[in-house]
Amino acid sequence: MDSISDIIYKGLKVSSRGWDRTRRYTKRYIFNKRSTNSKYLVMILAGYQDYVWDDVFKRISNFVPENYDVCIVSAGVRKEKLEKIAEKYGWSYLSTKANKLAMALNTTIKLHPKAEYIFKLDEDIFVGEHFFDELLDTYHFANNDGIYKIGFVAPVMNVNGASYRYFLKKIGCLSEYEEKYGIARITCDDDNVFKNGQSAKFLWSKSFPFDDIVNLFLNNQEKEYFTSPIRYSIGAILIHRERWNEAGGFISSGNGQLAWDELELCRFCMNSSSAIIISTKVFAGHFGFGKQKADMIPFYEKNKEKFGLFN
């Protein structure tokens, strides 16, 4: 007999996504397939922030293991430049007719039926050495630990409400940040880390030399991971196929509303007692949230060489 919590959870699953399950995938897409049926899949959601593509994709290409399948995913647009980047690096490219991010991601996973470990990256995420294998190691470490059922695993990111405080403490800049912007509150929305462009610039200024910061985290002697107590911004995550399937896939609002897939995935993790694991061994840079772009784009152009490889 189901407990009250089981009944409530089942009801939440039906109400939050039952109507949308038949629209989880789309048949209206263009797929340039170069997959190798790997059990590791990297999906890069891209199509709108071309000003960072050269550095972002060069970094991914340099650090992704050779036995991984990589697919650039565009929802609602088809970009010739992205097709050429995919061809250059031997990756697949998927473009869907509908501008629905969750549907595009689900379709990508469906087109890679052998993929068990699924990395989802946004187009404005900067990765470093051992990003993929260390994140995978953290997944296995936390899984073997047995303390938590894992929802998904993520890196420490600089511009991220769940992890920036840890980042600032690790590099010894927490007090300096709080003198400028107030308490570094762990939050996912209405705070400086989310909406203040100057805050994003500060966090990035402390992320250089980028690959030295990556190595600082790789050599971290602290506990392998911590858990996020709040909704996590899913610009860079690793999720197992079983957990993705249990969640009903990535879920859209039905009208293309941004971040709905994030909201529903975090809701699923909470309702199913699945932990959001943040690896203390992996650092990645997030360019910034929407309200921060006006300040971040000029900052990026002025400091472009620092975002490149080994700078």
What is the meaning of each model-derived region?
Residues 2-58:
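N-proximal low-complexity "stem/linker" segments adjacent to membrane-targeting elements
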Residues 14, 24, 199-311:
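C-terminal catalytic/acceptor-binding lobe
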Residues 57, 115, 129-141:
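Short alpha-helix within the catalytic core of nucleotide-sugar-dependent glycosyltransferases
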Residues 58-67:
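Short, acidic, metal-binding catalytic loop of nucleotide-sugar glycosyltransferases
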Residues 72-82:
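A conserved acidic beta->alpha catalytic loop
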Residues 106-117:
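Active-site nucleotide-sugar/metal-binding loop of Leloir-type enzymes
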Residues 115-126:
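Short beta-strand-to-loop acidic/aromatic patch adjacent to the donor-nucleotide binding site
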Residues 134-241:
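Conserved catalytic core of nucleotide-sugar-dependent glycosyltransferases
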